[in-house]
Amino acid sequence: MKKKILFLGVGGIGVSALAIAAKKLGADVAGYDSIPNKLTIKLESLGISIFSSPNNVDVSGYDMVVYSSAILDNHPLLSKARVLGVQCLKRAMFLALLMKDFRYSIAVTGTHGKTTTSSILATLLCKLDTTNSFVVGGVVKYADSNIQINGTDRLVIEADESDASFLYLNPNVAIVTNIDLDHMSTYKNSYDNLLENFANFLMKESIENIYLCVDDHGCNDLLDKYRSRVVGNIVSYGFAINSDARIYNYRVSDNLTTFTVEYKSGKYDFELQLPGKYNVQNATACVVACLDLGFSYKDIYNALATVKGVARRFDVYDKQISSHKIPVIDDYGHHPVEVTSSLGAVRDRYPNKKIIHVFQPHRYTRNRDLLIDWPKALSLADQLIILPTYSAGEQIIQGAESQDLIRNIPKVLLADSFDHVLYFLEKLVDDNTVVLIQGAGDITNLVGMIGE
């Protein structure tokens, strides 16, 4: 990749990964972001020039400009690049171009769990074969990075459905974790349109194998409607008895999850450090894909047992609140399905503990679109503490604020700040408590405010 490339919005997790990948593959790379952060500092340490003011950037000196979804069409650097005739690509369009440098690519998509699943697969493949690489949407704990380029053999990528940008990609293998109602403005608020876009992605001629979780209603709806039009070989996985790769013997003990997968003529036992049935589903997609790639069961078993997942997905910390030493869990979940799955995993791992759930809703549009689903999900803990909604740049929508999500939930407290949450926790926590701190906004900062 012998090009001079400018990445706009390079402080984001997705674009920063592409900038590093491009540099590793031989491109001359620079980046722009108006707000420096840990990622831009990391990029500078790798020899990538970072600009924080448009006035300091000469766009005419670049062959290509790659931009994130956070960069508006009227951004001065993007506008000038277009006037000058510089090739301008959205992040996913550049990812599609990057994939062509690799012999084989595996894309993981789905409404929930795609970052965790792609991180599990990335860890497995990099442990099974040191020539494998990945570019995903979260920090993979195995590598302490969202990107690792070890050559140009196999590449694991996370394919984003939120803006339908996965349609730009042409992988050899696709994993679909689930299909659910989220980011529905992308799909004209139509479930049929959502299914059709997933189907169009899976109909790519490049795709040889497709792994779909048939425990999920959306994946089943897709199969019912589009199976005959999909060219690739479809492998269903899940707890459902009719799965091609069937999960059973699910057990949780202390910090270990064990399960068995029956696939083709074999029965395979596995150990996993990650909690919850949803992570067993995620892991099953990965191990079955690895079996189909020709890796041995023994090597896959050993690699999976070491997988620690991705940052901010059920990260457990030992914390002290008042005089009580308790587990505090930091989690990125921000959709009713994710909240339900996470709380189920907390119950599995800590069956005899009182669960306090601290939740920060994310986006007023999500609150509004899923208003009917929130009360059931948020009522599953023993005590809920809810924060104001993290807007992510959206305007307030009347009837879709935090207090509107908790109707008829008996044990709920409204906190107006992180300090207010800490006050509540001091009053509520005892030795038999576990705290789940959850959301996609800045709520992760609350974890650091709690004493070790």
UniProtKB/Swiss-Prot annotation:
Protein name according to UniProt: UDP-N-acetylmuramate--L-alanine ligase
Stored SUPFAM superfamilies: MurCD N-terminal domain, MurD-like peptide ligases, catalytic domain, MurD-like peptide ligases, peptide-binding domain
The organism's place on the tree of life at top rank: Bacteria
HAMAP family: MurC
Species this chain originates from: Francisella philomiragia subsp. philomiragia (strain ATCC 25017 / CCUG 19701 / FSC 153 / O#319-036)
GO biological process: cell division; cell wall organization; peptidoglycan biosynthetic process; regulation of cell shape
Gene that specifies this protein: murC
Example of a GO MF term: UDP-N-acetylmuramate-L-alanine ligase activity
Sites where the protein binds ATP: G110, T111, H112, G113, K114, T115, T116
Gene Ontology, cellular component aspect: cytoplasm
Family designation: Belongs to the MurCDEF family.
